[in-house]
Amino acid sequence: MPHDGALTIRPYAPGDDAAVLQCQNRAFACHQDLDHWRWKFVRNPAGRTLLMLAEHARDGIVGVYGAMAAPALCDGQRVVAGQCVDHCVRSEWLQAGEHGLFVTLGRAFLERWLGEGEGQALFVYGLPTAGWRSGARHLGWQVVRDWDILFRELPGGAPPRPVSAELDVGTVPSFDADVDALFDRLAAEFGVTLVRDRAWFDWRYASRPDRRYTLLECRERRSGRLRGVAVHAVADVVRANTGFLLDWLAPADDLDTTTALLGAVERATQAAGSELLCGVFHPMDVRFQHLQELGYRVRGTPWFLTLRTARFDSLYFRERWYFTLGDSDLV
């Protein structure tokens, strides 16, 4: 493997878990537990652990560059994507290498994990911090678009949204196989998307060990047919105790299902004592327009979406990417 002085740059190997977590907890001055770490990097539905490590003979793991892997659909092809998160370098090693250890790790990560070969991710993306310009300059990261949010104030006592009597929205601990069929029916609408099937929803929401989400499904009362699903949570992001429409899978032209699911998410937000509901949709997606017609406004955020891809370019993704807040690890 390539070396930088006393450092070895290498991919993750089984058994590294505790050492990697120790490095991240030290760098971020936090306490993330091992179960959460394994959920994030090991137990994902893509079955890939996308991590590049810097190891010192005496100090152990001193740097991490990695991504959460997930199955994705791109131009009709099933591929793997990765959301880059939790990069870190211990402070005493930041200056190692010509451009610093972050750049050394990032280059090794992209060389190993970005591509169209077996075990690689076709694209990786992230919501970068203030230091992103180094990644743009040295690692080729490109800006896809800003992450604007849709929001609606929900003051206490506001009347519930009227919905169709033909539909029923309920909460479930996890989605069943019907959601696989729903995604398959809708897949043609999406140029690029994470594969929102049962395995992904189970991993991203139902099985996350340190946070609870509300999973909602909309069905026809008479037939029981699944029309759409949504995911809701409350978190201290944007402002304290904010409600979030985290995920959404429903036909773009099914306004009855849109209204029914949205009404249920709004009621869940109010029941949690929150007076603000936020969500994210692609600005070119018709759902972005529909929510504005249903009373939502648009606001900018500090976040923006960046990308490295082995195929196409940032413009392709900018125009075709179906994303929600659930594509990130913010909530």
Positions of the model-derived regions?
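Active-site/acyl-donor-binding loops of N-acyltransferases
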Residues: 4, 121-166, 222, 231-255, ...
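Secondary-structure boundary elements
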Residues: 112-120, 220-224
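Conserved N-terminal entry element of GNAT/NAT acetyltransferase domains
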Residues: 1-15, 156-175
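Conserved acetyl-CoA-binding loop-helix of GNAT-fold acetyltransferases
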Residues: 89, 94-113, 255-267
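Core nucleotidyl-transferase/polymerase catalytic module
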Residues: 2, 44-54, 62-66, 82-89, ...
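A conserved beta-strand-loop-helix scaffold within acyl/acetyltransferase catalytic domains
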Residues: 7-87, 129-130, 173-251
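Hydrophobic, Leu/Ile/Phe/Ala-enriched alpha-helical segments that form helix-helix packing faces
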Residues: 24-28, 109-117, 136, 186, ...
